[in-house]
């Protein structure tokens, strides 16, 4: 199935013309025919044209079904990697048996395994009763526990939670976090409920998940998402620990994104936005990719626009601003603002906290039109899914699209961006900072000790002993005739001498994770000649890892 699709896709799409005019190192990285193993060029032969996967899909809607959209991206990756998976199987089976095995496991990976649909009543503060709807989808249990956020939104649907759960599976695989994918949603507008009512909804939803076996430190671990945060996660942890987890010493590991006092971890609030920054950093500093885009490496002369000024948008903006990029526009659901001279994230954050909106910010003007189409180098869609579509993709002016949100780009828009030589840094890599630091928090809860507590003093003393040893060695060699020879550490080293704090360890671990994963995606793109199609490279990377788990573990009762 996947091979047939892949063969069809290999027929009729030529790579972007811009690739042929790139620098030599860029051409070596990105200029070959996409999707085929690297071979020496043959004089006089042009690369075979190829179709993009969205052209092969039956669904050509500008607003596709979200889960079908993710499945389409998966199919594209599967069609690219199937032959390699068959080739790498080290068994005595025939070629046909190997291919059947590979296709069978790919069919296991693709669908969403479990979807729990709930409805429960609450009594509101005015005495009226209301029935609340909620969902929890578990896409894959190839690794346990499952992991994924809980969002509160009137747009929540079965299709949405299935799509987001599947993205979580691939996201965890891309950054080597050993979780399966899951997602939950409660169909409410939290602005219409009091804090007391939201606590009732959250605690009751937790109990419903617990009764059905959809929450637990080793089963399924929720996290914050749209319109939820530390407060809601604290309610969930307390509800679970006070009921079904009463005798479980690891009960507070049932959820991540908690306050520090409830077992949370330093750096979790900003983790997704910081991950977005590190993801962009890894690609924007790669000279070969920047030469393809006609840009210079680094943040120094870059402008960017953020759509969505929530947790992800704010922290992405803060870190890019801190490293020299200039934010020229910010968009929200009620309007957008623009200032070509730059917008300060702290000033805008303070204004929004005071007024509840970014509109009216004195150091920017109202932007007429779609902020997604504003003139900038980097566009960060950090709001909701399916924001970049076939309709607006031709008008996007950014050279880099950094997907801070889940699923902001439809398949048709993705095709257009590839044709226009626009680099899309995909969601399943770029916004994985949240689940990465959630993994660190989960490990902290299981270990029952904060990061660095056992080593703070030892590391500090070791550093001072090292400096003293160097000083004494120099004095023995050159003598003390001119006095002692003090060893003065630099400011950066002085900050580290006292030992790494938990936040330092978390930030370092996140930066390393994003860097390593970016390199894996780049190598995969080169290996399969995918050019600027980083999304397919990320999906291929994820599929290879999930496939390996299923293949080596074996399939029970088949």
Swiss-Prot record:
Active site feature: 183
Tissue: Liver, brain and thyroid.
One CC-aspect GO term: mitochondrion
Residue numbers carrying Phosphoserine: 79, 128, 227, 384
UniProt xrefs under SMART domains: ELFV_dehydrog (SM00839)
Post-translational events: ADP-ribosylated by SIRT4, leading to inactivate glutamate dehydrogenase activity. Stoichiometry shows that ADP-ribosylation occurs in one subunit per catalytically active homohexamer.
Residue numbers binding substrate: 147, 171, 438
List of residues that carry Phosphothreonine: 410
Residue positions binding ADP: 450, 516
PROSITE patterns tied to this protein: GLFV_DEHYDROGENASE
GO BP: glutamate catabolic process; glutamine metabolic process; tricarboxylic acid metabolic process
Modification type N6-succinyllysine: residues: 68, 84, 110, 162, 183, 191, 200, 346, 352, 363, 365, 390, 415, 457, 477, 480, 503, 527, 545
Entry binding sites for NAD(+): 141-143, 176, 252, 444
GO molecular function, one term: GTP binding
Name this polypeptide is given: Glutamate dehydrogenase 1, mitochondrial
């Amino acid at each position: 199935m996947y091979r047939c699709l892949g063969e069809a896709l290999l027929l009729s799409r030529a790579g972007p013309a811009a690739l042929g005019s790139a620098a030599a190192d860029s051409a070596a990285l990105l200029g070959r025919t996409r999707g085929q193993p690297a071979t020496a060029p043959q004089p006089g032969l042009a690369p075979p044209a190829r179709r993009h996967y969205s052209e092969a899909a039956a669904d050509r809607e500008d607003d596709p079904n979200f889960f079908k959209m993710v499945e389409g991206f998966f199919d594209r990756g599967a069609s690219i990697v199937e032959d390699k998976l068959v080739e790498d199987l080290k068994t005595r089976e025939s070629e046909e048996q190997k291919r059947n095995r590979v296709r069978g496991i790919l069919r296991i990976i693709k669908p969403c395994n479990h979807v729990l649909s709930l409805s429960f009543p609450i009594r509101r503060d005015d005495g009226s009763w209301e029935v609340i709807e909620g969902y929890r989808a578990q896409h894959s249990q190839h690794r346990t526990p499952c992991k994924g956020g809980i969002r509160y939104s009137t747009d929540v649907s079965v299709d949405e939670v299935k799509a987001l759960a599947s993205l979580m599976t691939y996201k965890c695989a891309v950054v080597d976090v050993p979780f399966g994918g899951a997602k939950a949603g409660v169909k409410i507008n939290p602005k219409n409920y009091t804090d007391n009512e939201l606590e009732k909804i959250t605690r009751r939803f937790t109990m419903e998940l617990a009764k059905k076996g959809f929450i637990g430190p080793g089963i399924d671990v929720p996290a914050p998402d749209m319109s939820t945060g530390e407060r809601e996660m604290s309610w969930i942890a307390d509800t679970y620990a006070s009921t079904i987890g009463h005798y479980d010493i690891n009960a507070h590991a049932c959820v991540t994104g908690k306050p520090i006092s409830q077992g949370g971890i330093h750096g979790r609030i900003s983790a997704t936005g910081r991950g977005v920054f590190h993801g962009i950093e890894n690609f924007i500093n790669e000279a070969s990719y920047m030469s393809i885009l006609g840009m210079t490496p680094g943040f120094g002369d870059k402008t960017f626009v953020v759509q969505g000024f929530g947790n992800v948008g704010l922290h992405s903006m803060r870190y890019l601003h801190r490293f020299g990029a200039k934010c020229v526009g910010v968009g929200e659901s009620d309007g957008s603002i623009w200032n070509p001279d730059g917008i300060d994230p702290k000033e805008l954050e303070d204004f929004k906290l005071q007024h509840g909106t970014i509109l009216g910010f004195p150091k920017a003007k109202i932007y007429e039109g779609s902020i997604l189409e504003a003139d900038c180098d980097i566009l960060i869609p950090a709001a909701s899914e399916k924001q970049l579509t076939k309709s607006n993709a031709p008008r996007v002016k950014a050279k880099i699209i950094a997907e801070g949100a889940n699923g902001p780009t439809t398949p048709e828009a993705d095709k257009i961006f590839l044709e226009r030589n626009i680099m899309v840094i995909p969601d399943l890599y770029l916004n994985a900072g949240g689940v990465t630091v959630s993994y660190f928090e989960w490990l902290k809860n299981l270990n029952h000790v904060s990061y660095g507590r056992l080593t703070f003093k030892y590391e500090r003393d070791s550093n001072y002993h090292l400096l003293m040893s160097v000083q004494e060695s120099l004095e023995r060699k050159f003598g003390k005739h001119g006095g002692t020879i003090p060893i003065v550490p630099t400011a950066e080293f002085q900050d580290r001498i006292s030992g790494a704090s938990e936040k330092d360890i978390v930030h370092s671990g996140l930066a390393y994770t994003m860097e390593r994963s970016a390199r894996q995606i780049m190598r995969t793109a080169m290996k399969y000649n995918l050019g600027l199609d980083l999304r397919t490279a990320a999906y291929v990377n994820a599929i290879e890892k999930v496939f390996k788990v299923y293949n080596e573990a074996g399939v029970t009762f088949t």
